[in-house]
From Swiss-Prot:
Keywords linked to the UniProt accession: Aminoacyl-tRNA synthetase, ATP-binding, Cytoplasm, Ligase, Nucleotide-binding, Protein biosynthesis
Protein's GO biological process: arginyl-tRNA aminoacylation; glycyl-tRNA aminoacylation
Subcellular compartments: Cytoplasm
Gene Ontology molecular function terms on file: arginine-tRNA ligase activity; ATP binding; glycine-tRNA ligase activity
GO cellular component, one term: cytosol
EC id: 6.1.1.14
Main location: cytoplasm
Gene name of this polypeptide: glyS
Protein name: Glycine--tRNA ligase beta subunit
Origin species: Citrobacter koseri (strain ATCC BAA-895 / CDC 4225-83 / SGSC4696)
Chemical reaction(s) catalysed: tRNA(Gly) + glycine + ATP = glycyl-tRNA(Gly) + AMP + diphosphate
Subunit structure: Tetramer of two alpha and two beta subunits.
Length: 689
């Protein structure tokens, strides 16, 4: 069977840069799944993506599906014919479905009986016939949140489509995809190379596009070139380029023929906080900032043009002219904002609504101030500094700089606080109050910042849950999931002695009578414990380990983490499996009994040596582990409890629990309850699989 290279390219108008990679990867995954489901053998599936095209190249694609034998069993012979040997309606209906008559059917005989059988040789369909529908189906499944319609057509896609090319080897596959008839013509760069190129074979792609069309269709090659050229350009001026992955991806998705150039701006702008300058360069202009070896921003930036100009200086000058007014704005805002103290912005917070039922940003500031001070007292931070940080926490939102460059909130508060002579940990806290902003982000660096960050997030959680507006589905307008996980990360990773229950109660109390949800505390705790589940699953913990700890509903995050590590270690012990099974057995026995158990085990009632031995061991371990549990040394406790494996196994082998003697039965049940209580001090081990 001959194998050929298959090429599909969809030529479009400029695709959304932030979605380009995901579109291409999804397209490749969808087509691969279609090929596999159809049984079409193939080699590597390679994807290509540029601003105006999505393409796939499939190596060694089989010319057709393999032929296959089809067998379809019909009714049993006893039901297929009546007493006179005439076919039954069931048999005739089955035969019609197979496209035959009953007398054309074969018979299948096994040791269980005899049935009608249809057997046929089905010839595999050609790849040429199957591919158009596969491509159309794969495109329809792309993750496109908002589709476009263009012209008079009813066709919808992420952007208008101009060309479609489907080549199997050197043969053009006739098809209409997204309203466009397939053709050999592909389009080159808008301003360089040949505008239209006729491609003869699939193997010519993407080289023909590179050489004649001046388009680097290989996404990874384009990205690597931008990265290497930008690093070299930065070295040429004695610096290091800030090549953040997200911006590098976005720039890669914006250009077809990357040309890296270096430009500069006036050194006077370096007096403005670098964060504001970087925000302008990266966020607005898609430029790469350049830093000196000491980490200070240089008066240069690197950008990527989409054309190879005969006069690159003209492009450089143009970009310098574009960025200068933005930097001048930042300079003006910075100088204007510093003419008054940060604290002077407090009254203006009264004019900005936080949430209609929960009041203004000034109301939120007052709550954060009080809660940050309370948290600081719990964790041993400077209470005065924490309350001061709380008071100033939202003041920078009223500054010109943050109003214009919104992503500088927090960091500008820090710079203005330093200018005003505030304590350094207060200034730093203003910047770090929003941390962690995303998974893997840094945590607040000092205790005051931790207190403020937790206070800000807990105020939002208590308030929004307090009016019954918890997240539903994908909708989370107040970013409560991120806030909850942020609080948990800070408490766990900083090992802070905070309890979610008292923390939520205090946050809710500060709202006065504004909250309408009487179950706000439990709702917030349940929500945060749910975030714990997601966090630990991402960390690689098994679901049953998480469930075992969640069953105890510990509300101190640092304590929760200690239990998780203890149970995870317990699972590695040789005794773990048997003790988990024993706990499950004990749990089931106790659940089925509705008898009132004794607070203490009556040693005089014990008869069998095995139950005496187990009871003694339980008492010894209870006394021994009491201080261990109190200090949260759960791993040590579970290692000690692993010693119970042998006496527990022996007990269940030799002793009947549910005996007729009521006093003896209750005593044995009471002993098992005491045994289970020991393990429940850490987690519900019975849930381990």
């Amino acid at each position: 069977m001959s194998e050929k290279t298959f090429l599909v390219e969809i030529g479009t108008e400029e695709l959304p840069p932030k979605a380009l990679r995901s579109l291409a990867e999804s397209f490749a995954a969808n087509v691969t799944a279609e090929l596999d489901n159809a049984g079409l053998a193939h080699g590597n599936v390679e994807w290509f993506a540029a601003p105006r095209r999505l393409a796939l190249k499939v190596a060694n694609l089989a010319a057709s599906q393999p032929d296959r034998e089809v067998e379809k069993r019909g009714p049993a012979i006893a039901q297929a014919f009546d007493a006179e040997g005439k076919p039954s309606k069931a048999a005739e209906g089955w035969a019609r479905g197979c496209g035959i008559t009953v007398d054309q059917a074969e018979r299948l005989t096994t040791d269980k009986g005899e049935w009608l059988l249809y057997r046929a040789h089905v010839k595999g369909e050609s790849a040429e016939a199957l591919l158009p529908n596969m491509i159309a189906t794969s495109l329809a499944k792309l993750p496109i949140p908002k589709l476009m319609r263009w012209g008079a057509s009813d066709v919808h896609f992420v952007r208008p489509v101009h060309t479609v090319t489907l080549l199997l080897g050197d043969k053009l596959i006739p098809a209409t995809i997204l309203g466009i008839q397939s053709d050999r013509v592909i389009r080159g760069h808008r301003f360089m190379g040949e505008p239209e190129i006729t491609i003869d074979t699939a193997d010519q792609y993407p080289q023909i596009l590179l050489e004649r069309g001046k388009v680097v269709a290989d996404y990874e090659a384009r990205k690597a070139k931008i990265k290497a050229d930008a690093e070299e350009a930065a070295r040429q001026i004695g610096g290091n380029a800030d090549l953040s992955e997200s911006l590098l991806e976005e720039v890669t998705s914006l250009v077809e023929w990357p040309v890296v150039l270096t430009a500069k701006f006036e050194e006077k702008f370096l007096a403005v906080p670098s964060e504001a300058l970087v925000y302008t360069m990266k966020g607005d202009q898609k430029y790469f900032p350049v830093y000196a070896a000491d980490g200070k921003l240089l008066p240069n930036f690197i950008f990527v043009a989409n054309i190879e100009s005969k006069d690159p200086q003209q492009i450089i000058s143009g970009n310098e002219k574009v960025v200068r007014p933005r930097l001048a704005d930042a300079e003006f805002f910075f100088n204007t904002d510093r003419k008054k103290r940060l604290e002077d912005n407090l009254p203006r917070l009264q004019t900005v609504l936080f949430q209609q039922q929960l009041g203004t940003l000034r109301d939120k500031t007052d709550r954060i101030q009080a809660l940050a001070g309370w948290i600081a007292e719990q964790i041993g931070a400077d209470v005065n500094h924490a309350t001061r940080a709380g008071l100033l926490s939202k003041c920078d939102l009223m500054t010109n700089m943050v109003f214009e460059f919104t992503d500088t909130q927090g960091v500008m508060g820090m710079h203005y606080a330093r200018h005003d002579g505030e304590a350094e940990d207060v200034a730093v806290a203003l910047n770090e109050q929003y941390q962690p902003r995303f998974a893997g982000d840094d945590l607040p660096s000092n205790p005051v910042a931790c207190a403020l960050a937790i206070a800000d997030k807990m105020d939002t959680l208590a308030g929004i849950f307090g009016i019954g507006q918890h997240p539903k589905g994908d909708k989370d307008p107040f970013a409560l999931r991120r806030a909850a996980l942020g609080v948990l990360r800070i408490i766990v990773e900083k090992n802070l002695n905070l309890d979610l229950k008292t923390l939520t109660e205090e946050a809710a109390r500060l709202y006065g009578d504004k909250l309408t949800n009487a179950n706000v505390v439990d709702d917030v705790i349940d929500f945060m414990l749910g975030r714990f589940r997601a966090w630990y699953q991402d960390e690689g913990y098994t679901v049953d380990t998480i469930q075992a700890v969640l069953a105890r509903r510990p509300t101190r995050p640092a304590d929760f983490d200690a239990r998780m590590k203890a149970v995870s270690h317990f699972r590695t012990l040789e005794e773990a499996s048997a003790l988990a099974a024993a706990n499950k057995r004990v749990s089931n026995i106790l659940a089925k009994s509705d008898e009132v158990l004794n607070d203490r085990v009556n040693a005089a009632t014990l008869k069998e040596p095995e139950e005496i031995a187990l009871a003694l061991q339980v008492v010894v371990l209870r006394d021994k582990l009491e201080p261990v549990f109190a200090e949260g040394r759960y791993q040590e406790a579970l290692v000690e409890l692993a010693e119970l494996r042998e006496p527990v196994d022996t007990f269940f082998e030799k002793v009947m629990v549910m005996v007729d003697d009521k006093d003896l039965r209750i005593n044995r049940l009471s002993m098992l309850a005491k045994l289970r209580e020991l393990f429940l001090q850490v987690a519900d081990i019975s849930l381990l699989q």
